[in-house]
Structures are given as structure tokens and as C-alpha cells.
């Protein structure tokens, strides 16, 4: 089996985890108690969904997941909520005091008290796996636990599970809707620390999701529940190929192989289509060609940046539902003829396709319409550098005045870590710039100085 363990860190990670597991249960017909009436072979290990659920002797399905937060309120909602019977109590780990939006508290002071317990739980989950494929880690960049504890966890997972893939789903701080003043600090510190430990990180920008909810789903004031349900659809599309049998299945390592040309350039842009409310879906034609071209609209992206200003290095199209390869090929051929979509000259083919026959499921009472087919596009584009540049600029404004730095130093960090992290991100921006240069431009630049 190719099992995946999901780790949900901090408030954002835990709440997205809630939405994801609710959706997985609906997709697989698993009840909130963990029973699965449709599963005839009790204890059968060969079902595809066993990558995400382990099965007990009594036929109960338990998510292969750990929820961690340094303060209890958010995880308590799971302990008392509809799905409280689904999880083993030991999978829900909470501390007593939170990280207070402070990376240093999450990574050093408070985080290190809990890390061994968390790793112990992860160890127990991995012992139940026959062929652990890797970890999916959900967290935000802006919070103290999401940034600090995640980076500590990633470092330790690299030590304990060396070669196993680690994929992140990271909530990028929204440019307008900030929940903390120090988000730029936390984001840059966590990115610097996890950069070498993460194999692939899918960024989700809260503001982009707000705009999609307002524009496509006509929700005037989107709540976190609305955002998380949308994010869970995207996560479900990315993981569908691991949980169902499909025509063209894609596993975790395959994502990396096809999306990450250089180890540091591992931040694919996620786009999902169709995002549409029930009343609109009734009147629109959503064939493969339409949903495919919708993926190249910046408005449907999960991070605010403009790929028309950058170049694509690789593109992964994950279709689900009623889709045949012939339609996909036609749709992609059309896309390739458009001038606005540019690939780097060293990567001419650029498209990887996955098809899964399981149509998208929607949460009853949710905002999304039930559709016959959907596509999730993961593209590695140089335009993502815009998002880093925005964050770096905010970091610089605060750091020039050393604002708020004493809170971090007081928790045992050194000021040098700030400048080190900032330099690393400057290098990351430069990496993106160089990757986007055409081959001959790059050679001209290098050719000037003889060594």
C-alpha cells in the first residue's frame, strides 16, 4: 500500500483538516462513526481508500491523521463535534498555552515541549503502514504554531523518515485580510527553515479564496467555513488519485518528479475549476474544454499572482469525473496555441495529466454545485515569485525599524536568524528569476566573466 499520513498543525491546519476529512468521508461513504456500510470486506487491506484510512478489526475506519495545536480550543471543537468518534483521542494533541503568533514560541519555547509527543504519535501511525509514501502537512504561514511548530516538525521528520516525501499545504497570509501584524516575520522564518525539508508546497492565499467565494459563489461575507470547504475540494482533487482507482493515476512522488525542476523551486500554483454555485451551474456548459481554459484564468488561482507575466515550467492537470483522454488532449492543444501562456524554452512539453473517474462530491448544504467533472491544475510558474516579493517587502518595512523583534529574541531566538532567513528568500526570488531566463540570455550573462 502507498499510505499517506496527514498532519494538521495550528488553527488553520486543524480547521482545514476538519473540512478535508468531512469531505473524504462523504466521498468514500464513511459515516461519522467510522463505519462504512458499503465496504463488504471487513479488514480488506487492498482498497484504495486505505491509503488515507486504517481499518480496525471491528470494521471502523480511522483517518491516518494527527491534529496538533499548542492551545486547546480549536481541537476541542473536533473532540465535541460531529466527527468526534472518527478520530482516536490520541490523534488529537493539544497544549495549554498557544504560540501567540510568535514563530519563536512555536519553534523553540512551547513547541519543543510537545514535539516528542507528536513524533511518537506519528511513529505509531507509521507503524500501521505497510509502505508509507509520505506526509501531507497542513498549516498557515502567519500563525505562531503554523509557522514555528511546523518548521520544527519538518526538521524532525527529515531526521526520522529521511527519504519519505513531505508535501505542504500552506496558507499564505492574505495581502489585505491580515490576522496578525507579524505575519511577514513568521512567514519568512518558516519558509527559510522548511525550504530544504519540504519536497513540494502548495500555497493557498486566503485573499484569493475570499475573492473566488465572492465572485463565483456570490457569498457576500465569506466565513472561514466557506474558505475551508473550497480548499478541501482542492486538496481532495490533489489526493483523489491516491484514494481512488483511476485511468491515469498520479502518486505523491510523481507530483514532485513532474513539477519540481530544481529542489528549491517547489511552490506550484494551484487552480481549480469549475467553482460555481448551484443556481449558475444549471445554466452553464462545463465541458472539458471550458474547465481547462478556466484554469488559465488568474481569477481562479489560489494565490494572487499573474502567470501571464511569468513563464510556466511544468503543468499538472488532474481531472476527475466524466472525462476522456481525447477531450483532454484537444483542450490542451488549444491552450498551447494561446500566446499568453508561455513555457520556459528548456521545457517544451510541460503537461502531465491525471484522470480519475470519481466525480467530485459536494458537502450537503455547502456552496459548491454538484458537477460532472472538475479539474485541478498544479503549475510551476515563475510568477509565484511575485508572492514572495510582496511578503519580503513587508518584512523589510518592519525589520528596518526592528519592530516587534524583541518578542522573538525574548523567546530565545537570535536576531541573526532574521537576516539569514531574509537572505535565503532573496536568493529564492533570484532563483525564480534565473529559471525564467531564456537559455541564451542566461548564457550571455554568464559568458562575461571567465574563470
From Swiss-Prot:
Which tissues carry this protein?
Actively expressed in the lens but does not seem to be lens-specific.
Q: Where is the active site?
A: 254
A Gene Ontology term for the protein's cellular component: microtubule
What InterPro entries would the database entry show?
A: Alpha_tubulin (IPR002452), Tub_FtsZ_C (IPR008280), Tubulin (IPR000217), Tubulin/FtsZ-like_C (IPR037103), Tubulin/FtsZ_2-layer-sand-dom (IPR018316), Tubulin/FtsZ_GTPase_sf (IPR036525), Tubulin_C (IPR023123), Tubulin_CS (IPR017975)
Q: What is its main location?
A: cytoplasm
User: Which Pfam family is one of this chain's hits?
Assistant: Tubulin
Q: What is this protein called?
A: Tubulin alpha chain
Amino acid at each position: 500500500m502507498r499510505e499517506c499520513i496527514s498532519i494538521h498543525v495550528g488553527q488553520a491546519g486543524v480547521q482545514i483538516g476538519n473540512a478535508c476529512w468531512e469531505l473524504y468521508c462523504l466521498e468514500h461513504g464513511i459515516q461519522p462513526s467510522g463505519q462504512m456500510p458499503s465496504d463488504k470486506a471487513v479488514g480488506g487491506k487492498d482498497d484504495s481508500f486505505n491509503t488515507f484510512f486504517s481499518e480496525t478489526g471491528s470494521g471502523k475506519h480511522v483517518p491516518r491523521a494527527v491534529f496538533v495545536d499548542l492551545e486547546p480550543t480549536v481541537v476541542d471543537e473536533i473532540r465535541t463535534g460531529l466527527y468526534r468518534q472518527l478520530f482516536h483521542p490520541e490523534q488529537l494533541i493539544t497544549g495549554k498555552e498557544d504560540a501567540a503568533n510568535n514563530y519563536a514560541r512555536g519553534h523553540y519555547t512551547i513547541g519543543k515541549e510537545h514535539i516528542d509527543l507528536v513524533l511518537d504519535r506519528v511513529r505509531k501511525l507509521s507503524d500501521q503502514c505497510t509502505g508509507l509514501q509520505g506526509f501531507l502537512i497542513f498549516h498557515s504561514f502567519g500563525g505562531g504554531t503554523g509557522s514555528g511548530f511546523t518548521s520544527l516538525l519538518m526538521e524532525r521528520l527529515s531526521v526520522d523518515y529521511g527519504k519519505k516525501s513531505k508535501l505542504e499545504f500552506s496558507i499564505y497570509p492574505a495581502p489585505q485580510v491580515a490576522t496578525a501584524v507579524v505575519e511577514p516575520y513568521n512567514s519568512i522564518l518558516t519558509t527559510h527553515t522548511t525550504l530544504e525539508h519540504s519536497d513540494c508546497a502548495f500555497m493557498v492565499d486566503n485573499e484569493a479564496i475570499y475573492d473566488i467565494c465572492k465572485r463565483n459563489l456570490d457569498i457576500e461575507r465569506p466565513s472561514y467555513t466557506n474558505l475551508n470547504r473550497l480548499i478541501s475540494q482542492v486538496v481532495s482533487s490533489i489526493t483523489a488519485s491516491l484514494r481512488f482507482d483511476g485511468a491515469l493515476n498520479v502518486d505523491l512522488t510523481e507530483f514532485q518528479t513532474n513539477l519540481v525542476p530544481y529542489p528549491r523551486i517547489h511552490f506550484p500554483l494551484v487552480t481549480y475549476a469549475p467553482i460555481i454555485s448551484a443556481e449558475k451551474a444549471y445554466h452553464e456548459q462545463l465541458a472539458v474544454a471550458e474547465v481547462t481554459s478556466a484554469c488559465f484564468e488568474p481569477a481562479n488561482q489560489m494565490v494572487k499572482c499573474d502567470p501571464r507575466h511569468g513563464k510556466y515550467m511544468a503543468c499538472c492537470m488532474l481531472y476527475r469525473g466524466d472525462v476522456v483522454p481525447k477531450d483532454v488532449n484537444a483542450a490542451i492543444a488549444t491552450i498551447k496555441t494561446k500566446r499568453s501562456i508561455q513555457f520556459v524554452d528548456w521545457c517544451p512539453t510541460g503537461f502531465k495529466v491525471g484522470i480519475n473517474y470519481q466525480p467530485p462530491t459536494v458537502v450537503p448544504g455547502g456552496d459548491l454545485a454538484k458537477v460532472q467533472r472538475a479539474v485541478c491544475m498544479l503549475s510551476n510558474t515563475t510568477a509565484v515569485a511575485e508572492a514572495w516579493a510582496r511578503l519580503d517587502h513587508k518584512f523589510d518595512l518592519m525589520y528596518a525599524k526592528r519592530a516587534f523583534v524583541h518578542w522573538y529574541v525574548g523567546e530565545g531566538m537570535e536576531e541573526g536568524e532574521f537576516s539569514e532567513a531574509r537572505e535565503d528568500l532573496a536568493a529564492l526570488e533570484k532563483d525564480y528569476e534565473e529559471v525564467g531566463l531564456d537559455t541564451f540570455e542566461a548564457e550571455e550573462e554568464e559568458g562575461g566573466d571567465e574563470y
